[in-house]
Amino acid sequence: MSDTILSRLRAPQGVVDAVLDTDTFNEIDDQFALSYMLRSTERINTRAIYAAPFFNENSSSPEDGMLKSYEEIKTLLKLANREDLIPCAFEGSRRYLPDEKTPVDSPAARDLAARAAEYSPEHPLYVVGIGAITNVASALLLNPAIAENIVVVWLGGHSLEWPDTNEFNMMQDVAAAPGRASVSNASAESAPSSAAGTSRSGRKNHVPRAGRQSRKKSNRKFTAR
């Protein structure tokens, strides 16, 4: 790994511009991440939020998961009194990459492809992904030149000593994962989910999304204040 890439992966100083790519409706960790990011104005300037696709018991398809996440992002922005960022929230991919060379066009992918072009290797845009990395891979396929202008920090995969690679965010879109697709051309750091609470079964340890308890136990709703 070159010294240039290593230097870009070191903890930055001061305030950085960042975007968040998140399957917000899936589980509550994404809502905590977005809320924390919005409150960390001394370190992070949130430029955009992208809805990522997901498919499990909380959605009927990857597209449904993405659309539910998009609505959840807007709900959280309202609860956080950050309605000013709603125009910077974008729908993401409605399906996963069909292969490693074909992007899935979406408002999120187009925004990242255009937004990152305004940055430089010396002043990169930080791309934080905490879901399937379809949107980011698609943006890099749409505009490969942005690879040198972004630093990707992705919550996905397992640590190298883990006995398998059956991790939720990676398995959702294997073709888009770092090491397989265009994300490998960017400065990228993976935060293994095995170090962040993923069970050996490959899916995240389930926590109901913010605002309500498990439907099996109660229909009572809780509203953040």
Tell me the role of every PLM-derived stretch:
Residues 1-225:
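N-terminal acidic, glycine/proline-rich low-complexity segments
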